[in-house]
Amino acid sequence: MTTLELAVIGSSLLENEQRLPIDPAHFEGIPPGLRRHMTFEQGYAEPFGIPDARLEQLFAGVAPRDELLATRDVVLLHKMQAADLALAREGGVLWGWPHCVQQRELTQVAIDRRQTLIAWEA
């Protein structure tokens, strides 16, 4: 069975959005077997005093936001926007708060690009 590669993105295209999908306090509680398949956005934990070098020790590594969107199987992105989905790989999975009813453009981009959206509140 193939293990999917997971991207964790902390930045948002929404103004003043600063929440993170995974609190850095929980990093070491994630099983090592899963951590090997998780790549974080560059600078993800720096506001908490955790440098990228530490994330590279704990996880598969760090990479720029656009690269993660374009290359990973599953992307944790808390407040995704239509522009994010346009950059994400076709057929990929995005997990966060898509708000499909309120964001019709986002929903249409996901349909057109055959993407799967998973809502945290579901």
Regions found by a protein language model. Name each.
Residues 2-41:
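N-terminal phosphate-binding or glycine-rich loops at protein starts, especially the Walker A/P-loop
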Residues 9-11, 40-44, 77-80, 97-99:
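Structural motif
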Residues 73-122:
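Phosphate/diphosphate ligand-binding glycine-rich loop within oxidoreductases
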Residues 31-32, 56, 111:
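Anion (oxyanion) recognition and catalysis
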Residues 59-71:
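Short acidic low-complexity segments
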Residues 38-61:
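N-terminal beta-loop-helix "entrance" segment that forms/cooperates
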Residues 1-3, 35, 72, 90-91:
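A general structural motif
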Residues 39-40, 63, 117-120:
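Short hydrophobic alpha-helical runs that function as membrane-insertion/retention elements
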